[in-house]
């Protein structure tokens, strides 16, 4: 069964929230989000229409036009544009 866009988004956001809930030392570095998980630095970033994680190249979302990670007050967020709609989710 093909997931609709909203379901795909929510699933990806849930995965990111779960990942970040176990992490610490979150920082925004030029629209990317870096954090420490199991003593290793990870970075979430936008690349070639995808939201991915390094090291490695784990893909969380695809077919995205634009995406940025940002901090607002005490929260960390992702903003992205997909099929001419924009979305904004709190991640941490």
Regions found by a protein language model. Give the residues of each.
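Type IV pilin-like appendage domain
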Residues: 23-76
